[in-house]
């Protein structure tokens, strides 16, 4: 049995084939279920080689990873069904039909349960960006998650405590967006092949007047989805690479096995690509960690032919009391220097979720970074196009992160004092008040 299941078997026991002795069905680390027929007896069990549980549609696969089945005759028909949990907390019913075909019990394909309205949730490791997507004057939530999806969560009511619509998935060519690692896209190996870890920002990237979505993922590729408009606002064009006018080959993290296409931007995985007009020239720039973990500014420009490109990233951000940051301990190097938000390699790289907002009300953009909740770096000086930040610590004492949170600024009170909305590992969204005395 050890060699038949792709890790984390989570076995459940029942007489699945109706022959009077208990059999096994195991979950796994990825997305499948494995059937082990008991060819022995109840008192002396002996199991045939495992086979992927399948039905007339093919192998039964769940939506995400880390599959945990339990036995329950959920519909009371006398046959043992499976109730199966995924990594992101969703639960599916896999109904036993009561039939056996070629020695295998026949189950229907998974049907995921839904529930009545409750606190807003979007999968696991949710990554919100607050933005008025539908143009009705209320900040909505555009979010990614560990499954590699992107959702529109509409603000229905406005006001200080909004009422929210259920998450609706963005689509390309009629199919929900689903960025996944596949067999070789994760730097932590093929066991992560169904994860995508989308993290994003929203801006009018092509200047057509509609907001677009700029995204990073498990791959570390910075891409963008063009907004096609339409009544529901969910239709996007296929992903396109963000273009950079490199002077040579496109750089990449040292541990990447694959080479970026010329003119594309590949950086550390799972880090926020902040699309904003940083220099106030009317073009949308990009701020993101570079391939070595330094916070970098990619300035937008227009070529003589009219094409919009990014210049190679420049390290214009400095830390006055924290030149190297760690999301668990905070300051990893207290000396002054260029701001490096992660010096980890391989699987310890990237993961930084960032945003900019005037947190203390002094008229300068401060930097917010993921931590056990979120921390902030105060903008203390701007000189010759460069910025110096002072590390100020966490904005709250509440612990929300096992891996990372994802902050985005909100102003639901409408008083121009920013608060934070944090996406957390549990997929829920948490509101953090601003305790800073505003300089305004």
Where does each model-flagged region fall?
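Acidic/hydrophobic-patterned starts of short beta strands in beta-sheet-rich repeat architectures
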Residues: 18-27, 76-85, 135-144, 207-216, ...
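Blade-edge motifs of beta-propeller repeat domains
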Residues: 1-6, 39-64, 97-123, 156-195, ...
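Solenoidal tandem-repeat scaffolds enriched in leucines and small polar residues
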Residues: 6-12, 28-29, 86-87
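Conserved blade-register residue in beta-propeller folds
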Residues: 35-37, 93-95, 152-154, 224-226, ...
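Loop/turn-rich, solvent-exposed surfaces of beta-rich toroidal or solenoidal domains
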Residues: 293, 347-380
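Loop/turn residues immediately N-terminal
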Residues: 31-32, 89-90, 148-149, 220-221, ...
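Beta-propeller blade termini
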Residues: 9-16, 67-74, 126-133, 198-205, ...
């Amino acid at each position: 049995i050890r060699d038949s299941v792709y890790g984390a078997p989570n076995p459940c026991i029942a007489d699945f084939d109706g022959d009077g002795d208990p059999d096994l069905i195991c979950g796994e680390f990825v997305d499948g279920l494995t059937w082990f027929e008991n060819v022995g007896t109840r008192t002396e069990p002996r199991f045939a080689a495992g086979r992927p549980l399948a039905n007339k549609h093919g192998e039964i696969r769940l939506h995400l990873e880390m599959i945990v089945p339990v036995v329950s005759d959920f519909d009371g028909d006398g046959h043992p069904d499976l109730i199966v949990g995924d990594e992101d907390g969703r639960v599916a019913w896999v109904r036993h039909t009561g039939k056996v075909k070629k020695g295998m019990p026949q189950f229907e394909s998974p049907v995921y349960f839904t529930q009545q309205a409750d606190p807003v949730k979007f999968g696991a490791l949710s990554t919100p960006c607050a933005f008025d997507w539908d143009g009705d004057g209320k900040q909505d939530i555009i979010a990614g998650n560990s499954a590699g999806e992107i959702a529109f969560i509409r603000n229905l009511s406005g006001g200080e405590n909004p009422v929210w619509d259920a998450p609706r998935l963005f689509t390309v060519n009629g199919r929900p967006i689903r960025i996944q690692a596949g067999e070789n896209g994760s730097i932590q190996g093929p066991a992560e092949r169904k994860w995508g870890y989308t993290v994003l920002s929203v801006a009018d990237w092509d200047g057509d007047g509609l907001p677009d979505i700029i995204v990073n993922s498990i791959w570390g590729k910075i891409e963008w989805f063009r907004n096609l408009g339409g009544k529901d606002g969910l239709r996007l064009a296929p992903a396109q690479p963000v273009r950079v006018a490199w002077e040579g080959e496109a750089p990449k993290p040292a541990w990447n096995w694959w080479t970026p296409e010329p003119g594309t931007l590949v950086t550390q995985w799972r880090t926020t690509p902040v699309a904003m007009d940083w220099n106030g020239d009317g073009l949308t720039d990009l701020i993101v960690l570079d391939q070595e973990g330094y916070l970098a500014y990619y300035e937008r420009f227009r070529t003589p032919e009219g094409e919009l490109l990014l210049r190679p990233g420049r390290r214009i951000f400095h830390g006055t009391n924290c030149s190297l940051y760690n999301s668990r301990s905070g300051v990893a190097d207290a000396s002054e220097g260029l701001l490096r938000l992660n010096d980890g390699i391989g699987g310890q790289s990237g993961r930084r979720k960032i945003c900019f907002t005037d947190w203390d009300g002094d008229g300068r953009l401060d930097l917010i970074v993921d931590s056990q909740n979120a921390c902030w770096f105060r903008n203390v000086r701007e000189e010759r196009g460069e910025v110096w930040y002072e590390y100020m610590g966490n904005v709250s004492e509440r612990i929300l992160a096992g891996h990372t949170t994802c902050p985005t600024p909100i102003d639901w009170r409408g008083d121009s004092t920013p608060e934070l909305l944090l996406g957390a590992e549990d997929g829920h969204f948490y509101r953090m008040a601003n305790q800073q005395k505003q300089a305004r």
